[in-house]
Swiss-Prot record:
Record function comment: Component of N-methyl-D-aspartate (NMDA) receptors (NMDARs) that function as heterotetrameric, ligand-gated cation channels with high calcium permeability and voltage-dependent block by Mg(2+). Participates in synaptic plasticity for learning and memory formation. Channel activation requires binding of the neurotransmitter L-glutamate to the GluN2 subunit, glycine or D-serine binding to the GluN1 subunit, plus membrane depolarization to eliminate channel inhibition by Mg(2+). NMDARs mediate simultaneously the potasium efflux and the influx of calcium and sodium.
Membrane topology, record value: Multi-pass membrane protein
Tissue: Expressed in brain, mainly in the subcortical region.
Keyword Thylakoid recorded: no
Bias-annotated ranges (Pro residues): 899-929, 987-1001, 1080-1092
Name of encoding gene: Grin2d
Pfam annotation, one family: Lig_chan-Glu_bd
GO terms (BP aspect): adult locomotory behavior; calcium ion transmembrane import into cytosol; cellular response to L-glutamate; excitatory postsynaptic potential; ionotropic glutamate receptor signaling pathway; long-term synaptic potentiation; monoatomic cation transmembrane transport; positive regulation of excitatory postsynaptic potential
Protein name: Glutamate receptor ionotropic, NMDA 2D
Subunit structure: Heterotetramer. Forms heterotetrameric channels composed of two GluN1/zeta subunits (GRIN1), and two identical GluN2/epsilon subunits (GRIN2A, GRIN2B, GRIN2C or GRIN2D) or GluN3 subunits (GRIN3A or GRIN3B) (in vitro). In vivo, the subunit composition may depend on the expression levels of the different subunits. Interacts with PDZ domains of PATJ and DLG4.
């Protein structure tokens, strides 16, 4: 049918035939039923009229037969599809618009399916405009309608089953990436859409990680002539060219390219757009595809088409009709009828109506295919194919694009004929390689897409060109290759400008001549089956004779790999950070010398040891001793948080600071190097080279060394040529591949593996667990390199050498080495951060503890052996006194008493109720003072266990500091004979008391210096004992002992104690006897321990104030007093311990100090008879005498009870507090507190108590105090200080009270802490 070009449409007979055909086809719909009606026509289905419009004379023959075929192919429930085929002859846009508008105005249709073969780019905008104007869905299935040049009209339902320019470019760039064709040039004319084409290329290349090299865009003028076009095409050097132009413009472009030599096999052209692909023929092999001018298309042309590009016309049109039918079915389901659409192009625009109907045609599924469209009207997931023009000028499908995934056949390159023979191409190289990590790594292609991942290139197995494969033989398997050498190959192709086909050699060898035939990569190049061979190919003399090698790009040689063997940790590993000389210097020299130096500085310091002795501030000895100095320095070395005592001298402090700095450096250096010695020492064999005796004489070792290599390589060639005996031995241990050799090394079946150094270094760095190591930290023997093998005299050798040298100069080779040849394992560094220390690592420390425990057990056994066995074998000798004194003196240098806590303010005193006093029993006979030497020797002579009960318990505190040395001559109350002392005085008889458990305390004894001239008594001013013989008295003076007691046990429950006269030993002297009328009573057992006693002779501020207030006269009303367990919780009595202490023998040697000498109750002198200023103190309790009492004449004796006449005026300040009988005893109970010094003044209604003033002085000071008058000299039994209860409330001593000698009655059996001065003792 021939269409007219006027607006009135067809005329004459043609018009009548068209109207008759339309009437017979009955395209006009029947009366539309109401909503919900189903069916229509004869079958009850609604009629759906779809116009099939074909533009071009090629469709005239098939158009009449399409209607029934399409109606049968597209069946939709509830619709009667009635396709109407129309053919338009006009090809220009104006004629096309007029014909379509006349057709739509004369027919009542529901949709249009359009196809043309004109490839006119203006068709798509016309169809888009008509759809927006009439609201009709228009589906373009083929031809130039597959290109939209302008944005879609608003409300348009113009849909395209073809692919857009952007989608075609996306597929083309996937192909370029797959084959590493990164350099390209864009060639275009000024055809409609060329700007969009260039913009799409910029979008795809900018920001991509592939590294595209867009070498420019050429905009050609097809009418400029072939010479000008050829010059423009040659101006840009690129093998890959992307062409976008109209069909009639392609002929001059390809003719100019062919004249310029740019259409050969070395160049690849990609056609973009629907203008050229599939044109000029049916695609049947053998039928040439010609351009409009009759010129054939060049071989190797690629294009991207829709997957149905080879489908027949009926199937293509049926797909478009199905889209319209499925959308109409959705409309009918929602509305119940098919809406009336516009049929006149000249009517008012129906954009608002088209927007509401547009969504029903966007998501369609038909024939198991998805026809979902995007906003531009193209398919979201189009099915595309990549077609290539073969040498026979036929289109071949080489790839497909489904669901955004590309699948390509291999090989894609159209270089192979019927028998896979490559065509001649000067710019295309066939490259052979061999898999060997990390230089060439072969992986399978992606099983889903069949493509290679980024940074890898396709490679294949070797082709068999000897025999022709069968027609149905599969193509070579596609593989993906990557690695160090592959990256170099890609850079060479990019720099020099060639394409390549990569394949793997079949025999898997580098190259060796066997029976006169070369195999491997060298054989492929030598026999010219490959243009180039790249990989871990070592350059050697034999290979260089038949092929040419490029400059080496990797330095290598021969190396030896072994496996690390697990070693053991030495038990002395914890001592290995320092040498034995350092340990000896540290602990034998440095620690001892510095400790002694610090002690000497502290001893000579004005505020340290010596100063304390000189001033008497610390008469008990220094608190910083040699032992504490060593302990302090030891704690500083090892950062032990132990209690230490710091020196007070500035010089010693500086020494300690310097030692602390030294200790930090010492300990930090030790800990920093300890981890390296605590790990297991791994053993690695070392060899000097291939000529080492271990390789040349392996049988001489036991077991023999097992080593091998991979045969048919340069390593084996080197060994075979230079060490034939070694080669003959290692043949039995050769391995087929490197990976198998490494497995044998780890399993212990192979001791060493000899191979290329570059490969072994990589394997060692990448080994899991870092168990493999190359000997000598990667030491290389027979150094050489890797090169690229080429034909002899190849023209590619010089460009490749220059390119490799450029890579070396630009550090690209070094960058690739860091990328591919590096790893986490290093030969010279063993990473052990994650390894755990087990019992083997710490065995040495445990062994040291076991040895220390064994030595402790030996010392423990020796201690008990000496104490229970050997000490009784010692004969009676006076040398033991020297050993005893020496041990005590040494102990005094290593121990000291801790300083007491700070004092607290005292609470107010509490009154004491008056107890009842039973009659006192008569005192025992006087006990003379026992010399220290005699007492110690006598104790050693006595057998074990002769003392009273409790003696062993008393000695426990002594043994705590002195070990198996017995405290001798301490007045322990043992039953013993009365030997004569040095002064002729007998020893004190033991006092029989019931066994008592002594408190947990301790004591110590030292000798004091003897006076140069013996006084009349033990001390001046005190009564003398019975006179010894004159010779003995003149020869030996009375030795003095010191003793102090501190109660360490918790105080007994508070209760009102009962005092016992014998529990209060008072100082006295002379040979006076007891009063005849003194009552006697057996001392009962006390439940609570009695207080301790000490002498306190320092002046008191309160005493000074009292003296000044009375004008220096004696304070007759101020009477110090004391009582056992009196609950005065004065915390400030917790001061430093007293400096002068006296033993039991010294206190008990004066019989006048016994309570048995107290006068009868109610006697004239009963009221206040004290020997000293005595006071009651809570635990620890002390007996003290103040200096004020001495100055005030407190020892002025009252007349004895048997003396006649009134008693003289006494200057003694003594008295007792007035009790409060009305208070219950429970109200006076108070917890034991610190010792206090209490004084009180007698007042009219009671007693007031001045503030406490603790003092301390020795008994020598007491005896040397000034006296008020000669008449006050103490004489007779009345010279003893007596306990003085108040006359109105105090009676005789309580019968329940016990002696002050110890808890059970003997003060000597009490244990206490020793406070004494070793520098004043005779050691």
């Amino acid at each position: 049918m021939r269409g007219a070009g006027g607006p009135r449409g067809p005329r004459g007979p043609a018009k009548m035939l068209l109207l008759l055909a339309l009437a017979c086809a009955s395209p006009f719909p029947e009366e539309v039923p109401g909503p919900g009606a189903v069916g229509g026509g004869t079958g009850g289905a609604r009629p759906l009229n779809v116009a099939l419009v074909f533009s071009g004379p090629a469709y005239a023959a098939e158009a009449a037969r399409l209607g029934p075929a399409v109606a049968a192919a597209v069946r939709s429930p509830g619709l009667d599809v009635r396709p109407v085929a129309l053919v338009l002859n006009g090809s220009d846009p104006r004629s096309l618009v007029l014909q379509l508008c006349d057709l739509l105005s004369g027919l009542r249709v529901h949709g249009v399916v359009f196809e043309d073969d004109s490839r006119a780019p203006a068709v798509a905008p016309i169809l888009d405009f008509l759809s927006a104007q009439t609201s009709l869905p228009i589906v373009a299935v083929h031809g130039g309608a597959a290109l939209v040049l302008t944005p879609k009209e608003k409300g348009s339902t113009f849909l395209q089953l073809g692919s857009s320019t952007e989608q075609q470019l996306q597929v083309i760039f996937e192909v370029l990436e797959e084959y590493d064709w990164t350099s390209f040039v864009a060639v275009t004319t000024r055809a409609p859409g060329h700007r969009a084409f260039l913009s799409y290329i910029e979008v795809l290349t900018d920001g991509s990680l592939v590294g595209w090299e867009h070498r420019g865009a050429l905009t050609l003028d097809p009418g400029a002539g072939e010479a000008v076009l050829g010059a423009q095409l040659r101006s840009v050097s690129a093998q890959i060219r992307l062409l976008f132009c109209a069909r009639e413009e392609a002929e001059p472009v390809f003719r100019a390219a062919e004249e310029a030599g740019l259409t050969g096999p070395g160049y690849v052209w990609f056609m973009v757009g629907p203008q050229l692909a599939g044109g000029g023929g049916s695609g049947v092999p053998g039928e040439p595809l010609l351009l409009p001018g009759g010129s054939p298309l060049p071989a190797g042309l690629f294009a991207v088409r829709s997957a149905g590009w080879r489908d027949d016309l009926a199937r293509r049109v049926a797909a478009g009709v199905a889209v319209v039918a499925r959308g109409a079915q959705a409309l009918l389901r929602d509305y119940g009828f098919l809406p009336e659409l516009g049929h006149d192009c000249r009517t008012q625009n129906r954009t608002h109506r088209g927007e509401s109907l547009h969504r029903y045609f966007m998501n369609i599924t038909w024939d198991n295919r998805d026809y979902s469209f995007n906003e531009d009207g193209f398919l979201v997931n189009p099915s595309l194919v990549v077609i290539s023009l073969t040498r026979d000028r036929t289109w071949e499908v080489v790839g497909s694009w489904e669901q955004q995934t590309l699948r390509l056949k291999y090989p894609l390159w159209s270089r192979y004929g019927r028998f896979l023979q490559p065509v001649d191409d000067t710019q295309h190289l066939t490259v052979a390689t061999l898999e060997e990590r990390p230089f060439v790594i072969v992986e399978p292609a992606d099983p889903i897409s069949g493509t290679c991942i980024r940074d890898s290139v396709p490679c294949r197995s070797q082709l068999n060109r000897t025999h022709s494969p069968p027609p149905d033989a599969p193509r070579p398997e596609k593989r993906c290759c990557k690695g160090f050498c592959i990256d170099i190959l890609k850079r060479l192709a990019h720099t020099i400008g060639f394409s390549y086909d990569l394949y793997l050699v079949t025999n898997g060898k580098h190259g060796k001549k066997i029976d006169g035939v070369w195999n491997g990569m060298i054989g492929e190049v030598f026999y010219q089956r490959a243009d180039m061979a790249i990989g871990s190919l070592t350059i050697n003399e034999e290979r260089s004779e038949i092929v040419d090698f490029s400059v080496p790009f990797v330095e290598t040689g021969i190396s030896v790999m072994v496996a690390r063997s697990n070693g053991t940790v030495s038990p002395s590993a914890f001592l290995e950070p320092y040498s034995p000389a350092v340990w000896v210097m540290m602990f034998v020299m440095c620690l001892t010398v510095v400790a002694v130096t610090v002690f000497i500085f502290e001893y000579l310091s004005p505020v340290g040891y010596n100063r304390s002795l000189a001033t008497g501030k610390r008469p008990g000895g220094s608190t910083f001793t040699i032992g504490k100095s060593i302990w302090l320095l030891w704690a500083l070395v090892f950062n032990n948080s132990v209690p230490v005592e710091n020196p007070r001298g500035t010089t010693s402090k500086i020494m300690v600071l310097v030692w602390a700095f030294f200790a930090v450096i010492f300990l930090a250096s030790y800990t920093a190097n300890l981890a390296a010695f605590m790990i297991q020492e791994e053993y690695v064999d070392t060899v000097s080279g291939l000529s080492d005796r271990k390789f040349q004489r392996p049988q001489e070792q036991y077991p023999p060394l097992k080593f091998g290599t991979v045969p048919n390589g340069s390593t084996e060639k080197n060994i075979r040529s230079n060490y034939p005996d070694m080669h003959s031995y290692m043949v039995r241990y050769n391995q087929p591949r490197v990976e198998e050799a490494l497995t044998q090394l780890k399993a212990g079946k192979l001791d060493a593996f000899i191979y290329d150094a570059a490969v072994l270094n990589y394997m060692a760095r990448k080994d899991e667990g870092c168990k493999l190591v190359t000997i000598g930290s990667g030491k290389v023997f027979a150094t050489t390199g890797y090169g690229i093998a080429l034909h002899k005299g190849s023209r590619w050798k010089r460009p490749i050498d220059l390119a490799l040298l450029q890579f070396l100069g630009d550090d690209e080779i070094e960058m690739l080495e860091r990328l591919w040849l590096s790893g986490i394992c290093h030969n010279d560094k063993i990473e052990v951060m994650s390894s755990k220390l087990d019992i083997d690592n710490m065995a040495g420390v445990f062994y040291m503890l076991l040895v220390a425990m064994g030595l402790s057990l030996l010392v423990f056994a020796w201690e008990h052996l000496v104490y229970w066995r050997l000490r009784h074998c010692l004969g009676p000798t006076h040398r033991m006194d020297f050993l005893l004194a020496f041990s005590r003196g040494m102990y005094s240098c290593c121990s000291a008493e801790a300083a007491p806590p700070p004092a607290k303010p005292p609470p107010p005193p509490q009154p004491l109720p008056s107890p009842a006093y039973p009659a006192a029993r008569p005192p025992p006979g006087p006990a003379p003072f026992v010399p220290r030497e005699r007492a110690a020797a006598d104790r050693w002579r006595r057998a074990k266990g002769t003392g009273p009960p409790g003696g062993a318990a008393i000695a426990d505190g002594f043994h705590r500091y002195y070990g198996p040395i017995e405290p001798q001559g301490l007045g322990l109350g043992e039953a013993r004979a009365a030997p004569r002392g040095a002064a002729g005085r007998p020893l004190s008889p033991p006092t029989t008391q019931p066994p008592q458990k002594p408190p947990p305390s301790y004591f110590a004894i030292v000798r004091e210096q003897e006076p140069t001239e013996p006084p009349a008594g033990a001390f001046p001013g005190f009564p003398s004992p019975p006179a010894p013989p004159a010779a003995a008295a003149a020869a030996v003076g009375p030795p003095l002992c010191r003793l102090a007691f501190e109660d360490e046990s918790p105080p007994a429950p508070s209760r009102w104690p009962r005092s016992d006269p014998e529990s209060q030993p008072l100082l006295g002297g002379g040979a006076g006897g007891p009063s005849a009328g003194a009552p006697t009573a057996p001392p009962p057992r006390r439940a609570a321990p009695p207080p301790c006693a000490y002498l306190d002779l320092e002046p008191s501020p309160s005493d000074s104030e009292d003296s000044e207030s009375l004008g220096g006269a004696s304070l007759g009303g101020l009477e110090p007093w004391w009582f056992a367990d009196f609950p005065y919780p004065y915390a400030e009595r917790l001061g430093p311990p007293p400096g002068r202490y006296w033993s039991v023998d010294k206190l008990g040697g004066w019989r006048a100090g016994s309570w048995d000498y107290l006068p009868p109750r109610g006697g004239p002198a009963w009221h206040c008879r004290h020997c000293a200023s005595l006071e009651l103190l809570p635990p620890p309790r002390h007996l003290s005498c103040s200096h004020d009492g001495l100055d005030g004449g407190w020892w002025a004796p009252p007349p004895p009870p048997w003396a006649a006449g009134p008693p003289p005026r006494r200057r003694a300040r003594c008295g007792c507090p007035r009790p409060h009988p009305h208070r219950p005893r429970a109200s006076h109970r108070a917890p034991a507190a610190a010792p206090h010094h209490h004084r009180h003044r007698r007042a009219a209604g009671g007693w007031d108590f001045p503030p406490p003033a603790p003092t301390s002085r020795s008994l020598e000071d007491l005896s040397s105090c000034p006296r008020a008058a000669p008449t006050r000299r103490l004489t007779g039994p009345s010279r003893h200080a007596r306990r003085c209860p108040h006359a109105a409330h105090w009676g005789p001593p309580l019968p329940t009270a016990s002696h002050r000698r110890h808890r059970g009655g003997d003060l000597g059996t009490r244990r206490g802490s020793a406070h004494f001065s070793s520098l004043e003792s005779e050691v």
